Amino acid sequence: MYHIPDVLSTDQVAEFTRQLAQAEWVDGRVTVGSQGAAVKQNQQIDTRTPLYARLQAAVLDMLRGHPQFFSAALPRTISAPLFNRYGPGETYGFHVDGAVRQNGEAGWMRTDLSATLFLCDPESYEGGELVIEDTYGQHRVKLPAGHLVLYPASSLHCVTPVTRGVRQASFLWIQSMVRDDKQRAMLYDLDRTIQSLKARFGDGEEVLSLLNMYHNLLRQWTEV
């Protein structure tokens, strides 16, 4: 699980908030199967509206230009982002995301990673935590507006009931060029180490050796 900060700037978050106030919202169960529908109580932006098209394009632009997101996800395909909101009493019980999903005209994609981009500051609502279960236990996530959490789509997860205010977010899925979570995590850690060493010492012989190792591993594990 990775915390990706500052996907949106403060000004961009404010603009999203302004536009979300004008959105047309529908029952969030329209995008899930029977298992998810039984535990899902929220609202989503109507994907047939021009406003939705603008907002999802803006999120995609921000993600494609964010180096840390690219390093952590190694995206081959990013789904069209969706937008949800939870008011008082609304929640989404524990569930697992589908292994594959239809991604518009692009066709089917495998869901290796799930991502939630928070669009409200945590002080503006109570409850509404994203709870993610993995082999190390439960992780409760409630990030600042404009920050994103990235986690394996195979994880059981839920959104706890909102008790005050409104929680708004964008959510999406990624098919990675590297399918295996452990391999992808190793590449991410190696890339972060390389970037840190480059910042301190420049492109020395040791850094170039690590960079060579990174690309050889990427070449071995990538599916394109």
Curated annotation (Swiss-Prot):
Record InterPro entries: Oxoglu/Fe-dep_dioxygenase_dom (IPR005123), PKHD_C (IPR041097), PKHD_hydroxylase (IPR023550), Pro_4_hyd_alph (IPR006620), Pro_4_hyd_alph_FE2OG_OXY (IPR044862)
Gene3D superfamilies for the chain: q2cbj1_9rhob like domain, Rabenosyn, Rab binding domain
Note accompanying the cofactor annotation: Binds 1 Fe(2+) ion per subunit.
Origin: domain of life: Bacteria
Known EC number: 1.14.11.-
PROSITE patterns: FE2OG_OXY (PS51471)
Names of required cofactors: Fe(2+); L-ascorbate
GO molecular function: 2-oxoglutarate-dependent dioxygenase activity; iron ion binding; L-ascorbic acid binding
GO biological process, one term: DNA damage response
Binding site for 2-oxoglutarate: 167
Residues reported in the UniProt entry to bind Fe cation: 95, 97, 157
Position of the signal peptide: none
Alphabetically ordered keywords of this record: Dioxygenase, Iron, Metal-binding, Oxidoreductase, Vitamin C
Domain called Fe2OG dioxygenase: residue spans: 77-176
Cited PANTHER family: PKHD-TYPE HYDROXYLASE YBIX
HAMAP family: Hydroxyl_YbiX (MF_00657)
Record's protein name: PKHD-type hydroxylase KPN78578_12210
Organism: Klebsiella pneumoniae subsp. pneumoniae (strain ATCC 700721 / MGH 78578)
